[in-house]
């Protein structure tokens, strides 16, 4: 019983973001389709070779995507929304880009498909759309072509396919409502055809991803698995693959399926290996997801060995990454600026492949010396002063309930704030950022590269802040912002100014399409060595008599959009960040800033996958926000901002944040999101976004007025604010000016009644 290893997938973008550059060049019309396809081929060949060199036995094929793997699956099944179809019914790479982006070098532009988070990760997928009576057929053969490519290169491969039940679960019905699960029998023949094609190519194992099996699924969906897999059995061996959580609650459903193996995430799930071994059919292969595919930390391989060794020789066993390595940066070896101590704590995708090779060899031979050597830096990290700050740990331990309570209730605070700010009805504001022009980006880059000294940099930033204040005063906005010219990214900026974070040069991970992010890494206890935002906020306030908002990113969002530590709980990290930012609130207040916004766009997306785990998360998430804000005096107005999300099921928690004003993204839902606030009888003030900042379109005065009147039917007008959906960082100044002028005019019209 030789143990093999494999990965569930590998990052697609390339070490230098080659895929991103090729996509964007093609979209801009600067390169041909052939040139784009050649970059994809080169990246796939390189990534297979790198995994093989690092010691991986079975290489994943089908994990590469031109935009997103769920979208690739939609095309495979011939699921192309009518608005994106070619006239002759054919499907090509431009069809795929039109669905993802709303436009491509050929074909008519049309609204892009909806995009949403892939389970609880920071990757986004394109939501499949289903209509009644839909037909499916094998259309886009990218998977088969890539299998042929890998076989021609002499690789031992394991194709990767998103399973039929999870695919339907991830989609949405458009038009006339019906149960999308009823389409299962219509898509299964396409899956049968694909598996038959793979069998023809001599493929032994197919990784069929069914991550929906870790969720608390409705019974009808659980019941659908057996007939679905009865239809798919027999052509190749199927490795039923789950990740991001454990499978124990759904194990009865799983063990009844006619598959030949099961992959389990032993990092994020609480499954017990001995229990799994006992309950799985004895002839099944167990793929143990022991290496974390979605973090950057070196694994304690001695611990991983101990976790699995008792079942070695008792059943067929593979060792694997917990999930696809898509969520991890590619290669640690190119990081030249991290100091040796910190660097020794990390492992990126290629290093994780090496870990799988070490683990496989030790399990096959029983010799664990190499594992102990690899794990030595982890033991050292446990005692490092870079990790532990006794002052932070002491302060966290001393938190009391009082620390998360404002001095008085909202009604008392609102009166003090009205007396202080004397704002008109329908007060107007923006969410925080203004257009990040080429000049601003060049200024920051020159400073970062050392081509510009600190004095000249500060003079340049001050000038941009001044321009933003002048623009807002000219437009007639009531509450101003400084525009965030000094910030590259709302999380990175704070991470750079807090102790306990480090940054990489090339730690890019794909967010969606061509967008990549470089998340900060939390390596130790978090504290604030000096004020972060106070100086620029104070400068902006000195330029105007109108209130200027202080702008902070909230603790839960900073946590969710970073790579967290693994040696303490997420709750601990969030509360440490909250304490650091609490001091920032106090300093802003002392500097005369009377309105402070704490953005928490990630509060909802941080929810655990299982609803039964929600309460505990929301409890500490809300507490972290309140610790951050509660130091503010009654007449300091605390705002928060949240992006597009379903609020209904977390309204209690949103109200519990006790922000004086919440601004939300509502324009794309035509104010429907306000239903939750109305039904809940939300007591504080609210600014429903009146136009979509993701589009260059300028909304008319009438359109904005109509939306606000609609909002006033649900929320009393005296509690409504007027603002765009989101920050204006990605927009140009011409459409920003035009849209804000119309927004201010609409508010003035409503004041006149």
From Swiss-Prot:
Binding, Zn(2+): 641, 643, 665, 726
Designated name of the protein: 5-methyltetrahydropteroyltriglutamate--homocysteine methyltransferase
Molecular functions per Gene Ontology: 5-methyltetrahydropteroyltriglutamate-homocysteine S-methyltransferase activity; zinc ion binding
Pathway membership: Amino-acid biosynthesis; L-methionine biosynthesis via de novo pathway; L-methionine from L-homocysteine (MetE route): step 1/1
Keywords tagged on the record: Amino-acid biosynthesis, Metal-binding, Methionine biosynthesis, Methyltransferase, Repeat, Transferase, Zinc
NCBIfam families referenced in this protein's UniProt entry, alphabetically: met_syn_B12ind, PRK05222.1
InterPro entries, per the entry: Cbl-indep_Met_Synth_N, Cobalamin-indep_Met_synthase, Met_Synth_C/arc, UROD/MetE-like_sf
Primary gene name: metE
PANTHER family per UniProt: 5-METHYLTETRAHYDROPTEROYLTRIGLUTAMATE--HOMOCYSTEINE METHYLTRANSFERASE (PTHR30519)
E.C. number: 2.1.1.14
Enzyme class: transferase
Xref: CDD domains: CIMS_C_terminal_like, CIMS_N_terminal_like
Example GO BP: methionine biosynthetic process
Transmembrane portions of the chain: none
Highest taxon in the source lineage: Bacteria
Binding-site positions, L-homocysteine: 431-433, 484, 599
Active site (UniProt): 694
Keyword Amino-acid biosynthesis (UniProt): yes
UniProt cofactor(s): Zn(2+)
Co-factor: note: Binds 1 zinc ion per subunit.
UniProt-annotated binding residues for L-methionine: 431-433, 484, 599
Binding-site list for 5-methyltetrahydropteroyltri-L-glutamate: 17-20, 117, 515-516, 561, 605
Catalytic activity as recorded in UniProt: 5-methyltetrahydropteroyltri-L-glutamate + L-homocysteine = tetrahydropteroyltri-L-glutamate + L-methionine
